[in-house]
């Protein structure tokens, strides 16, 4: 069936901000779908609220709307653009939910829009838990016994029917949000209440437990001709009871018998046919001794399909998009081999391992147990010839400190941790085997297949040999083949990494590279995608062209998000446009940078010195770029420079800003000297290596002070400390964070306005991309604060000072490429807080707001062009207001207090654009799922320091027609200023208090600013309840003031502007 000629214009819905359960995989699949449709001559209209994505670049689609993913707004875009069809399954759960809502609202009928690919019926039959169960039973497939419920009373009845434990799965939610495992009746009611609130149709499925069964996934594809193929099968190392996004996963499955594989393969094809899904789909099974149950079907591109795409090299999203416009699998050419049709099933001659990356280093109080609801923010993937090699490379890729076996647990802890799955379980298995526990005992405690435990045992036994035997070249060859990195060998033998590396080279033990080609080398591949191993033949052939290697950003985690992948992709694109051969090394399967056709060569490897050097030794690039991959690649800059200097046989150099200059900016003392030279103000500060010194410095500066370790990303272990007791507690916890670095103590500029600047420098001129004014005050991490372009309250004098400082610092640090500078303004004076001569997390937002691709411009500067010759000298002046707001993951992390501070907590971001601040801020909050109410009740409970600013906020809210209520202190204070409202009991004074009111849906907005740590308990319970009951909440007075301004604007009845980013840029003359 050739492409449909009646489909000329297609609307694609993106997935919105990165959140737990929905990470960068949808940018990767969305970008692939956009390109796939454009190849077929179809016009693409894209809507997504997340500016940090490649898919929202103006050139990716014919019209790009960065607007809230809200059904009413998408309807306005449909009214304006009149697309012929819409593809729902590319934007993850968000895309499916909005498509279902629009269908229910009758929008598609009204405007004659067809749903392409998977029909709404199929979405309903998979997402509505009751319909799904009926469909499966109708075709004779087995599902766990279950019942869909809509009330707590119905949930109680299920306990009588099915007994405990039970699994709760809400309908239409993401990453298992709101679900969980209930082992008692109380737990069941608590999880069900949470799940009913989360579900779009207030429905949860309560099902019998298949805990301990193996979890296996099949990635399947079907076209309108009913041709079906199985792309990949994957096996979770963790058994059922842990969400697949939380489990370590291997592909292809390792423990299935051929009979089991054929049984599940046949079931998969039967299911996708029965559901009439067109495109890619993911089916999850529980398997036990030849018996199976179907757990769920995702009728869309998912996190698992991104993994399957990278594991096999098969571009699932690209093919799905072509099927949606009527093409058949045998008409679509496999873009990796360029000569086989997409109907050929991929074959693998290697093993991949995926391990999630969790944010528990940021949320110390959050519950670390892994359940059916996701908590991880990102993941890594590793490729090896054997299970052991793949697993060891995966551990190396995680970029966390828990090097194998460095953590110690006692016997009781080991048994507890094996029984309950946590983020450390794989490390605990290592430790248990080292202690002599048997494979059988560990398998019984964990329900993990003994096959996987025996593979880990093989690694543990090899470690014993390395410790006790002489490291001969035979043993070294054997351990490298097994996958041991040089750093681990150095630890086990008491040598340095360099010594191990030299031993290898002397013995001629060098890494070789194998190709991922979708067909186990049966056909010639056209798009090179490689992994390293230790075998005889090497499949990569270096060219003589000028080439540059770019280091990627690794797994998505808090503090290091998709923004750095965005910068990496832009740098690659710019260099390829210059005719330079460009290579990427990265290990994140969810991103655009690891797509098969982003770079000239892709190396799927851990981002460590050894693996980077392996690529350099083989390919001999002219230069390496480290400034685009965030802290991960910046941390490699100095060591890599030293290693390249040590290796006289290599001519490769680090391009862009010199690592020594990057280090100067990171080293507070050296940087302070530079600032003094330029006469630039900095907050008063000092550093300390002991508790005694810390107290002395803090007393000299005066409390409150901001304390942090040196060299950190995303403000880890950073805190505002108000008194000596607080400081003593911090010193006990923080000195562990970085033993060899002192702790920094700065004057905390209370009430200052924070400013961010992104710029490009070519060592002669400086291009300022934008000056951003933060909405939250200094003291909230810049990555967690909303910010606005252009600044709304900074005077011309202050802006002139900011521009002057930016130029001096960029030229003073000899920056070649990007630089981000954070400043704060207090009383008309500008203080510089820090400078980072590398890509920053605001680059994508700035690029979209002002229409300048800063990362591309920086890459061209590094390639040798000057800003002047490219015509980039003036700071852009947008006519519109752009606001970046963040997405906080508290709803997925029970137990964490939803409060902002100097340590970064957000996972993703959204953007609101309009012609005035009020409407832009309203859009940003709507996009961040924090809808500001225009009617209803607002609860206020504010710390004393914020009360003077509250009066104006309360007046605006009352004038807009909202009812106010608050706790006694706030009510009395406002009454003295002529604002009267109802009093509500404090939480610890008993009922009825605000939490009771939230439970009864009687509160529409919570404004609660936290007091000092000790008396936060009440506030913490209110904020936590707001998250659990899905009530919009605000925790800073600045955000409350911005919200009041937005509500005031919206009540004037002005419509929101619906315009594409292309139109906004056109108005700027771009």
From Swiss-Prot:
Residues 133-325, 672-863 form the ATP-grasp domain. Residues 1-399 are annotated as: Carboxyphosphate synthetic domain. Mn(2+) 1 binds at residues 284, 296. Mn(2+) 4 binds at residues 834, 836. One of its GO terms (cellular component) is cytoplasm. Disulfide bonds: none annotated. It catalyses: hydrogencarbonate + L-glutamine + 2 ATP + H2O = carbamoyl phosphate + L-glutamate + 2 ADP + phosphate + 2 H(+). Mg(2+) 4 binds at residues 834, 836. Mg(2+) 3 binds at residues 822, 834. Large subunit of the glutamine-dependent carbamoyl phosphate synthetase (CPSase). CPSase catalyzes the formation of carbamoyl phosphate from the ammonia moiety of glutamine, carbonate, and phosphate donated by ATP, constituting the first step of 2 biosynthetic pathways, one leading to arginine and/or urea and the other to pyrimidine nucleotides. PANTHER family: CARBAMOYL-PHOSPHATE SYNTHASE [AMMONIA], MITOCHONDRIAL, CARBAMOYLTRANSFERASE FAMILY MEMBER. This is Carbamoyl phosphate synthase large chain. It comes from Methanosarcina acetivorans (strain ATCC 35395 / DSM 2834 / JCM 12185 / C2A). The gene is carB.
């Amino acid at each position: 069936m050739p492409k449909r000629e009646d489909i000329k214009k297609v609307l694609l819905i993106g997935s919105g901000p990165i959140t737990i359960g929905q990470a960068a995989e949808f940018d990767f699949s969305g970008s692939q779908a956009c390109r796939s449709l454009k190849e077929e001559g179809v016009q693409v209209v894209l809507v997504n609220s997340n500016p940090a994505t490649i898919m929202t670049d103006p050139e990716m689609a014919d019209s790009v709307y960065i607007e809230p993913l809200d059904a009413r707004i998408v309807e306005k875009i449909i009214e304006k653009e009149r697309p012929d069809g819409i593809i729902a399954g590319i934007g993850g759960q968000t895309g499916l939910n909005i498509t279902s809502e629009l269908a229910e609202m009758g929008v598609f009928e009204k405007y004659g829009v067809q749903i392409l690919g998977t029909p709404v019926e199929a979405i309903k039959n998979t997402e509505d838990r009751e319909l799904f169960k009926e469909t499966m039973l109708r075709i004779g497939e087995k599902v766990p016994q279950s019942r869909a419920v809509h009330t707590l009373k119905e949930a109680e009845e299920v306990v009588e029917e099915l007994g405990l434990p039970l699994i709760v799965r809400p309908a239409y939610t993401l990453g298992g949000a709101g679900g969980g495992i209930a082992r008692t009746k109380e737990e069941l009611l608590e999880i069900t209440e949470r799940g009913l609130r989360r579900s779009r149709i207030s429905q949860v499925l309560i099902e019998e437990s298949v805990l301990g069964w193996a979890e296996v996934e099949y990635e399947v594809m079907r076209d309108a001709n009913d041709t079906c193929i199985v792309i990949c099968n994957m096996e979770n190392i963790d058994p059922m009871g842990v969400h697949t996004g939380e489990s370590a996963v291997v592909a292809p499955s390792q423990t299935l018998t051929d009979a089991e594989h054929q049984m599940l393969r046949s079931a998969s094809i039967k299911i996708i046919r029965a559901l009439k899904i067109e495109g890619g789909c993911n089916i999850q099974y529980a398997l036990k001794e030849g018996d199976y149950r179907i757990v769920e079907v995702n009728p869309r591109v998912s996190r698992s399909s991104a993994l399957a795409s990278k594991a096999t090299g098969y571009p699932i999203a690209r093919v799905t998009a072509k099927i949606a416009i009527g093409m058949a699998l045998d008409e679509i050419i496999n873009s990796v081999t360029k000569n086989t049709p997409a109907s050929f099933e991929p074959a693998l001659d290697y093993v991949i391992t995926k391990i999630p990356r969790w944010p528990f280093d940021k949320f110390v109080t959050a519950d670390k147990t892994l359940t059916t609801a996701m908590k991880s923010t990102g993941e890594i993937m590793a490729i090896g010839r054997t299970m052991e090699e793949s697993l060891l490379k995966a551990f190396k890729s995680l970029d966390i400190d828990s090097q194998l076996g460095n953590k110690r647990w006692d016997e009781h802890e080991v048994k507890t941790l094996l029984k309950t799955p946590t983020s450390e379980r794989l490390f605990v298995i290592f430790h248990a085997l080292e202690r002599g526990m048997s494979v059988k005992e560990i398998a019984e405690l964990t329900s993990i297949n003994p096959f996987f435990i025996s593979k880990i045992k093989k690694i543990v036994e090899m470690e014993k040999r390395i410790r006790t035997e002489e490291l001969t070249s035979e043993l070294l060859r054997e351990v490298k083949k097994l996958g041991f990195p040089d750093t681990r060998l150095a630890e086990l033998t008491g040598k340095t990494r360099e010594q191990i590396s030299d031993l290898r080279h002397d013995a001629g033990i060098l890494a070789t590279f194998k190709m991922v080609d979708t067909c186990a080398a049966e056909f010639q591949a056209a798009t090179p995608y490689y992994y390293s191993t230790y075998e005889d033949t090497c499949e990569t052939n270096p060219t003589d062209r000028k080439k540059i290697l770019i280091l990627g950003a690794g797994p998505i985690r808090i503090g290091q998000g998709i923004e750095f992948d965005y910068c990496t992709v832009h740098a690659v694109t710019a260099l390829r446009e210059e005719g330079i051969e460009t290579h990427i090394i990265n290990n994140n399967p969810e991103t655009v940078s690891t797509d098969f056709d982003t770079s000239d060569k892709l190396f799927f490897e851990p981002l460590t010195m050894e693996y980077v050097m392996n690529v350099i030794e083989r390919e001999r690039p002219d230069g390496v770029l480290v400034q685009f991959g965030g802290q991960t690649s910046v941390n490699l800059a100095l060591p890599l420079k030293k290693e390249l200097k040590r290796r006289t046989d290599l001519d490769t150099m680090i391009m862009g800003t010199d690592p020594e200059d990057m280090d100067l900016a990171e080293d507070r003392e050296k940087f302070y000297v530079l600032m003094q030279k330029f006469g630039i103000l900095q907050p008063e500060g000092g550093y300390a290596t002991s508790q005694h010194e810390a107290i002395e410095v803090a007393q000299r500066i005066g409390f409150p002070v901001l304390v942090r370790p040196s060299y950190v990303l995303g403000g880890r272990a950073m805190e505002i400390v108000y008194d000596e007791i607080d400081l003593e507690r911090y010193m006990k916890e923080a000195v562990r964070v970085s033993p060899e670095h002192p702790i920094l103590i700065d004057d905390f500029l209370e009430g200052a306005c924070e400013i961010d600047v992104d710029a490009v420098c070519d060592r002669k001129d400086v291009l300022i991309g934008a000056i951003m004014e933060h909405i939250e005050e200094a003291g909230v991490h810049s990555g967690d604060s909303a910010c606005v372009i252009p600044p709304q309250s900074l005077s011309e004098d202050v802006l002139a000072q900011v521009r002057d400082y930016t130029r001096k610092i960029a030229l003073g640090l000899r920056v070649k490429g990007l630089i981000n500078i954070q400043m704060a303004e207090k009383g008309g004076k500008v203080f510089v807080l820090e400078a980072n001569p590398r890509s920053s997390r605001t680059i994508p937002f700035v690029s979209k707001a002002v229409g300048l691709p800063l990362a591309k411009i920086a890459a061209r500067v590094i390639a040798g062009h000057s800003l002047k010759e490219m015509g980039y000298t003036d700071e852009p002046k947008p006519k519109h207001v752009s606001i970046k707001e963040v997405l906080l993951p508290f709803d997925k992390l029970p137990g964490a207090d939803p409060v902002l501070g100097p340590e970064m907590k957000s996972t993703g971001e959204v953007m609101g654009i309009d012609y005035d601040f009020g409407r832009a801020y309203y859009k940003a909050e709507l996009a961040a799922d924090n809808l500001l109410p225009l009617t209803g009740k607002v609860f206020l409970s504010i710390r004393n320091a914020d009360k003077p600013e509250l009066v104006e906020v309360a007046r605006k809210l009352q004038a807009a027609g909202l009812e106010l209520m608050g706790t006694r202190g706030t009510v009395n204070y406002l009454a003295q200023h002529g604002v009267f409202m109802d009093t509500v009991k404090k939480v610890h004074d008993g009922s009825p208090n605000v939490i009771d009111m939230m439970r009864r849906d009687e509160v529409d907005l919570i404004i609660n600013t936290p007091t000092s740590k000790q008396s936060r308990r009440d506030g913490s319970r209110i904020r936590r309840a707001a998250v659990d009951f899905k009530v919009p909440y605000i925790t800073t007075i600045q955000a409350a003031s911005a919200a009041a301004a937005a509500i005031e604007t919206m009540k004037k009845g002005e419509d929101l502007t619906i315009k594409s980013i292309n139109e906004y840029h056109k108005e700027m003359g771009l």
